[in-house]
A protein has these predicted regions:
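Extracytoplasmic/periplasmic terminal helices and flexible tails
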Residues: 72-75, 82-87, 95-200
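Short extracytoplasmic
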Residues: 32-63
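Short, Lys/Arg- and Gly-enriched loop/turn segments at beta-strand edges
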Residues: 55-66, 79-85, 150-152
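Anionic-ligand-binding alpha/beta catalytic cores of soluble enzymes and soluble regulatory domains
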Residues: 50, 63-76
């Protein structure tokens, strides 16, 4: 039992260190995404992030196999969004950006892939903003990439953090504004400039 707890702690600690390392030194990217609510094995809430742009041209002569690790070549377009430039069993030449992925399927020269950074942790009370998303909303994941691995720093809906469009965020903001109201800001029953008449 103790060994299992130590292993779980070590895994969580390593993931935390890896996330911090990539977040500090990684190259920033923006990628279109669709957030979904799920619950992890540890019982904490998180957002499952689906990336619709998950299919690209296969650059090699030998077709990939399902489950194989591949390298997806990436760049940025003029607006700063990530562009997928194809995939291969080999890393790109020096200077080329890429992300590691796993093959989901292959057909007619195109490979469907899945990346390893498909989760984004959020406080449970702030996740309900997902239900307010509209089909025409611009939903972007802010990502950092380093040596093929990535982490999601944030999810933005029309430029606003996903956390900020939740009912929980609205309630917290209203609570803060109410607490910030000082005694002097509150309405008084008697105006301080008025003096009650002297009784005789």
């Amino acid at each position: 039992m103790l060994f299992r707890s130590l292993v779980q702690f070590a895994v969580v600690a390593y993931m935390g260190w890896r996330w911090h390392n990539i977040a500090v030194d990684g190259i920033p990217y923006q990628w279109r995404c669709v957030p979904r609510l799920e619950v992890s094995a540890f019982g904490t809430d998180y957002v499952r992030v689906v990336f619709p742009e998950d299919t690209t041209q296969w650059k090699d002569d030998t077709p990939p196999e399902k489950g194989q690790q591949i390298y997806v070549y990436i760049s940025r377009d003029t607006s700063g969004l990530m562009e997928i430039q194809g995939a291969s069993a080999s890393k790109p030449f020096v200077g080329g950006d890429y992300m590691q992925a796993t093959v989901v399927s292959y057909q007619d020269g195109f490979v469907q892939f899945q990346v390893g950074f498909d989760r984004y942790r959020m406080a449970p009370e702030l996740t309900d903003g997902i239900y307010n998303l509209q089909p025409d909303d611009s939903v972007i994941a802010s990502i950092r990439m380093k040596r093929g691995e990535g982490v999601i720093e944030g999810i933005f809906v029309n430029g606003i953090p996903l956390e900020n469009i939740s009912n929980g965020a609205a309630m917290a903001k209203a609570r803060q504004e109410k607490e910030a109201q000082t005694l002097f800001d509150r309405p008084h029953l008697v105006d301080t400039g008025m003096v009650p008449p002297k009784e005789e």
